[in-house]
Swiss-Prot record:
It comes from the Eukaryota. It comes from Gallus gallus (Chicken). One of its GO terms (cellular component) is chromatin. Residues 209-246 are annotated as: RNA-binding RGG-box. InterPro entries: KH_dom, KH_dom_type_1, KH_dom_type_1_sf, ROK_N. Residues 51-385 are annotated as: 2 X 22 AA approximate repeats. This is Heterogeneous nuclear ribonucleoprotein K.
Length: 427
C-alpha cells in the first residue's frame, strides 16, 4: 500500500544553485543508470487547444518531429477538452522531443528562452505508482531534490481507466529530466492487474484525477496546479483553461441528455436499500475557525438525523475501495465519517471522507451546466467532491467529500446553498 509520505510536497529549498560535490556525483550516477537504447512509450495529457501547436498547420510540426527524431508521435482526436500526446522512442529522444514541444504550448509561447516554469501531466498505470513513490516516499523525495521539480501523483484514476496523472512542475529542462528518470523507473516494473488506458472522450468533470476539467488560475508567469490542498493531503489541481464544451455523447450536467453507455458498474455497491427522506438538510454552516464541529457518536452519527457507520480506516485505504462500502440501508440520510489517521491538510486536522446521499433529480442543481457549479464549490471549499452515478433502479446519487473538517463543512454548506438557489428545494 502506498504510504502517507506520498502526500507530502517536497521542494528544493536551496537558493544558491549549488550542491556539494558528492551530491552531484550521486545525482549523475542516478541519471546514468538509464538504459538509453530501450524503446519506451510516453503519454502526456494535454489540453485539446494545444493539439494544434503540436500538430502544426497541415501536420507540419508533427511530421517534422517524426522525421527529425525517427520517433512515433501522435495526438489522437477527442471530443473533449483533453487529448493524449503519445511518443514512442528511447528516453533521450523523448526528452529532446519534449524540449521542442513545451515552448510551443499556448501557456508558454510568450516566453523567450527556456527560463520559465512549466507543467506536464504524465499518465502511468496505477500499479506503477509505488515504484515512483518508493519506500516511505524516499524515491519521490529523491526525484524532487535531484531534478529540482515539484511532483504530484494524483490518487484517483482517470475516468473509466487504470491510469493516474503525475503532475511535474519546474523549469522545462528539469521537468524533462524528471520525466526521463520516471520512464526508466516504470520501464523496470511490469504492470500488475488489468490495463485500461485513459480515453479522453470519457473525461468527466466529477472526477478529481488531475486533468483539465477544473477551474484554472489564468495568471501567466507561474506554474498552476499547486495552490491548495485537496484529497488525502495532496495539492489540489487547477481547474480548466480550455474552452471546449463537453462531448455531446456524454451526459450534460443538467441531466438532460443521455450518456454514452453506462460506465462499468462499481463493485460493492449493490444491496443498499431503504427509503431515504428528502427533506433533511445537510449539516449546518461551518462554525468560526477553531470552533467545535458537530460531535459524532460511535456509529458516526451526528445527533439523530443521520444513519451511518464509523469507518476506522486510513483515508488511502478508503479511497482504494471502488467505492467504499460505507452505508447500511435505512431511512434518512446515509452518512459516513472516515478518519484519515496521519494525513493532514494545510488548514490543520486530519483528512477525512464524508458521503451524503441526495435525490438524483437534485444533482443538476449542484453540478450545473458544463460542471461549472461543482467546479466553483470545489474551488471555494478546497475539498475534493465526487458525485457517483445513480445505481440502476435507484433514485439517489452519492456525493463523496474529502478534506479537512473545515473544508468538508464549507463544501456541505455550499452544496446546500446551491440546491436551495437552483432547484427551489431543500434537502
Amino acid at each position: 500500500m502506498e504510504t502517507e509520505q506520498q502526500e507530502e510536497t517536497f521542494t528544493n529549498t536551496e537558493t544558491n544553485g549549488k550542491r556539494p560535490a558528492e551530491d552531484m556525483e550521486e545525482e549523475q550516477a542516478f541519471k546514468r543508470s538509464r538504459n538509453t537504447d530501450e524503446m519506451v512509450e510516453l503519454r502526456i495529457l494535454l489540453q485539446s487547444k494545444n493539439a494544434g501547436a503540436v500538430i502544426g498547420k497541415g501536420g507540419k510540426n508533427i511530421k517534422a518531429l517524426r522525421t527529425d527524431y525517427n520517433a512515433s508521435v501522435s495526438v489522437p482526436d477527442s471530443s473533449g477538452p483533453e487529448r493524449i500526446l503519445s511518443i514512442s522512442a528511447d528516453t533521450e529522444t523523448i526528452g529532446e522531443i519534449l524540449k521542442k514541444i513545451i515552448p510551443t504550448l499556448e501557456e508558454y509561447q510568450h516566453y523567450k528562452g527556456s527560463d520559465f516554469d512549466c507543467e506536464l501531466r504524465l499518465l502511468i498505470h496505477q500499479s506503477l505508482a509505488g515504484g515512483i513513490i518508493g519506500v516511505k516516499g524516499a524515491k519521490i523525495k529523491e526525484l524532487r531534490e535531484n531534478t529540482q521539480t515539484t511532483i504530484k501523483l494524483f490518487q484517483e484514476c482517470c475516468p473509466h481507466s487504470t491510469d493516474r496523472v503525475v503532475l511535474i512542475g519546474g523549469k522545462p529542462d528539469r521537468v524533462v529530466e524528471c520525466i526521463k528518470i520516471i520512464l526508466d523507473l516504470i520501464s523496470e516494473s511490469p504492470i500488475k492487474g488489468r490495463a485500461q488506458p485513459y480515453d479522453p472522450n470519457f473525461y468527466d468533470e466529477t472526477y478529481d484525477y488531475g486533468g483539465f476539467t477544473m477551474m484554472f488560475d489564468d495568471r501567466r508567469g507561474r506554474p498552476v496546479g499547486f495552490p491548495m490542498r485537496g484529497r488525502g493531503g495532496f495539492d489540489r489541481m487547477p481547474p480548466n483553461r480550455g474552452g471546449r464544451p463537453m462531448p455531446p455523447s456524454r451526459r450534460d450536467y443538467d441531466d438532460m441528455s443521455p450518456r454514452r453507455g453506462p460506465p462499468p458498474p462499481p463493485p460493492g455497491r449493490g444491496g443498499r436499500g431503504g427509503s431515504r427522506a428528502r427533506n433533511l438538510p445537510l449539516p449546518p454552516p461551518p462554525p468560526p475557525r477553531g470552533g467545535d464541529l458537530m460531535s459524532y457518536d460511535r456509529r458516526g452519527r451526528p445527533g439523530d438525523r443521520y444513519d451511518g457507520m464509523m469507518m476506522q480506516c486510513h483515508v488511502d485505504a478508503c479511497d482504494d475501495m471502488q467505492p467504499p462500502e460505507l452505508f447500511e440501508g435505512g431511512s434518512g440520510y446515509d452518512y459516513s465519517y472516515a478518519g484519515g489517521r496521519g494525513s493532514y491538510g494545510d488548514l490543520g486536522g486530519p483528512i477525512i471522507t464524508t458521503q451524503v446521499t441526495i435525490p438524483k433529480d437534485l444533482a443538476g442543481s449542484i453540478i450545473g451546466k458544463g460542471g461549472q457549479r461543482i467546479k466553483q464549490i470545489r474551488h471555494e471549499s478546497g475539498a475534493s467532491i465526487k458525485i457517483d452515478e445513480p445505481l440502476e433502479g435507484s433514485e439517489d446519487r452519492i456525493i463523496t467529500i474529502t478534506g479537512t473538517q473545515d473544508q468538508i463543512q464549507n463544501a456541505q454548506y455550499l452544496l446546500q446553498n446551491s440546491v436551495k438557489q437552483y432547484s427551489g428545494k431543500f434537502f
